[in-house]
């Protein structure tokens, strides 16, 4: 069982309650603080983000540190497309810049599976990245 004291909606949920849970995801990811983000994830998290595979909270924390060192000024918007029991399907877009100042946008989909306590157990994201003008 998870030891964090974070409170958020737990499954099973409808679209409205699932959207409330996504607020936590969006807010913490936009904080760029790995310790805050991993509060919403199970210790045994299994995750794929693009071409990276992550297993466990410590790998997730290291992945996030690398991500935010490379993807500066990262902002993400999540759009719930479906929710059933402890699963969600989400469309997302994110913008960020690299160290040279060039801006990018990611478009993609994420699927989540949550445990009974509301922690993400599985998260798989497929995305494409395009260069944009700011």
Predicted regions and their residues:
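Short, low-complexity N-terminal intrinsically disordered segments enriched in polar/charged residues
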Residues: 1-43
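A beta-strand edge to alpha-helix "cap/lid" segment located at domain peripheries
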Residues: 2-13, 61-134
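Structured beta->alpha junctions
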Residues: 26, 51-52, 80-82
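Residue-level signal for short amphipathic helical patches enriched in basic/charged
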Residues: 32, 48, 115
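Short beta-strand segments in beta-sandwich/barrel cores
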Residues: 45-46, 95
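Short solvent-exposed beta->alpha transition segments
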Residues: 46-68
């Amino acid at each position: 069982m998870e030891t964090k004291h974070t409170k958020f909606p737990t499954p099973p949920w409808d679209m409205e309650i699932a959207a409330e849970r996504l607020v936590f995801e969006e807010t913490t990811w936009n904080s760029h603080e790995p310790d805050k983000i991993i509060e919403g994830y199970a210790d045994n998290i299994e995750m794929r983000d693009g071409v990276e595979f992550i297993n466990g909270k410590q790998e997730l924390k290291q992945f996030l540190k690398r991500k935010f060192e490379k993807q500066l000024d990262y902002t993400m918007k999540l759009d719930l497309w479906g929710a059933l029991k402890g699963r969600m399907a989400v469309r997302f877009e994110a913008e960020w810049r690299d160290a040279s100042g060039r801006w990018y946008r990611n478009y993609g989909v994420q699927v989540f599976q949550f445990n009974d306590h509301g922690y993400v157990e599985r998260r798989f994201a497929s995305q494409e990245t395009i260069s944009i003008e700011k």
